[in-house]
Structures are given as structure tokens and as C-alpha cells.
A protein has these predicted regions:
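Short, extreme N-terminal segment that most often corresponds to the first beta-strand
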Residues: 2-31, 39-40
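Structured loops at beta-to-helix junctions and adjacent beta-edge loops in soluble globular domains
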Residues: 19, 50-51
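Compact beta-rich and alpha/beta scaffold cores in large eukaryotic transport/transcription complexes
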Residues: 32-33, 51-52
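Short, intrinsically disordered, mixed-charge
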Residues: 33-34, 75
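Secondary-structure boundary/capping signal
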Residues: 36-37, 81
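Ser/Thr- and Asn-enriched, surface-exposed coil loops between beta-strands
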Residues: 42-44
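Charged, compositionally biased boundary regions
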Residues: 53-209
Length: 209
């Protein structure tokens, strides 16, 4: 695929961040039904890196797939799961925690917010983020950027939406999240998988059955 093609049609991808150590995540990961790389992602966090079969081969929307995965993991474990996802048109997240209704937010490709402010506040509360400093940073992610889409190619490449996800991760570093090098929002499943396999201590989860 040429550089121009990859810019015009970014590949869908996702990351599943779990607020638990890798051993705890590996114990419930078979619920997802397919093996995937699992690496540490900071203090008390781990990340699963899906290969993307359901949306690459089965044609299912990436957000629907990872929302279901996050909910399945969270119901089977005592810790929350944060799914980050993106495709050519949008990007967003879903936070699942126990049997509570998952909460999520969406940005359009050019970074325009397309979610509800209350969802972001619920997100912050469930993760125990600072109600002042972190809440202010998250609130800025729900504001429309007057320059959204003005940069040539920004809307086409989904750069604005990916920048919003990076902003979200910047806030979450204060909650302990540190993604390994190469696990960047906006990359396709192939590149994410290659980056995960290069992380020291990577392990593969098992598939159910």
C-alpha cells in the first residue's frame, strides 16, 4: 500500500487496556476467544493488542467488537477495561467496569467531538481521576477545535481523532498508564502486533477451549 493510500484510508485498530497485572489479565483473556499479545502498560496496567480478525476478515465494526470484548473481560474480573479504537471515520473509547453499563466517547476523523459530556465525567469518576485537574483536561477533549479539519489531510487521515486519543492517554499517564513504544493510536493491527511482539516480556494469551 502506498503512503498516499495509507493516509487516505487508515486501517482500523484497537488496544484493550486493563487495570491489572499481566498474570491477572491472562487468566480471563480466553473469554475473548482468540489469542493476542499481552504486555505491561505502566504501573498496575496491562494492554492486550488484538490482531483484528473480526473487523479485518469478518467485516464487523471495530468499535462494536472491542466494546463487547471490554464488557466480557470486565464482567469476569474485578478491574476495569478501557478499549481504545479507531477507523477511517472515527475514534473513541469504551470503559467497562463490572456489571455497570459501559461508558464511551467518540470523535469524528477531524477531531470533532461526537459524544456526551456526561460520559466523560462518568469515565473520570470510575477511574478515580482527579476531579479538578484531570477533569479539566478531559473537558478540553470534549470541546470543538475551531481549527479542526483545516490542516490539509487532517480529516482524511483521521489525525484529529487520533490526536484526541493521544490527549486522553496523556491524562491517563497520571493514573499509571504508559504504553510501550510503537503502541500508538491510529496504527493498524499489523503494526501494533509487530510492536507488541518486540516488547520485552510479551506473552500470548490463550483462546478458550
Amino acid at each position: 500500500m502506498s503512503t498516499e493510500e495509507s493516509m487516505s484510508a487508515p486501517a482500523p485498530g484497537a488496544l484493550l487496556l486493563c487495570r491489572a497485572e499481566p498474570d491477572s489479565v491472562a487468566a480471563v483473556a480466553p473469554l475473548l476467544g482468540e489469542p493476542m499479545p499481552l504486555v505491561r502498560a505502566g504501573d498496575g496496567w496491562s494492554v492486550l493488542v488484538p490482531e483484528g480478525g473480526p473487523w479485518r476478515d469478518g467485516g464487523e465494526p471495530v468499535d462494536r467488537v472491542v466494546t463487547g470484548w471490554a464488557a466480557a473481560l470486565a464482567v469476569g474480573a474485578p478491574w476495569p477495561v478501557l478499549a481504545l479504537w479507531w477507523d477511517a471515520d472515527r475514534a473513541g473509547y469504551t470503559l467497562a467496569s463490572g456489571f455497570r453499563r459501559p461508558v464511551g466517547y467518540v470523535w469524528l476523523a477531524n477531531g470533532t467531538p461526537a459524544g456526551e459530556d456526561e460520559a466523560m465525567r462518568t469515565f473520570a469518576a470510575r477511574l478515580g481521576l482527579d476531579p479538578v485537574l484531570d477533569a479539566q483536561s478531559l473537558d478540553r477533549l470534549t470541546r470543538t477545535d475551531p481549527d479542526a479539519g483545516r490542516e490539509p489531510g487532517a480529516a482524511r487521515a483521521g489525525a484529529g481523532a487520533r490526536a484526541r486519543l493521544r490527549g486522553l492517554l496523556a491524562v491517563l499517564t497520571r493514573a499509571g498508564i504508559t504504553l510501550p513504544a510503537g503502541l500508538d493510536p491510529g496504527e493498524g493491527a499489523d503494526r501494533l502486533g509487530a510492536a507488541a511482539r518486540a516488547v520485552p516480556g510479551v506473552r500470548w494469551t490463550e483462546a478458550a477451549g
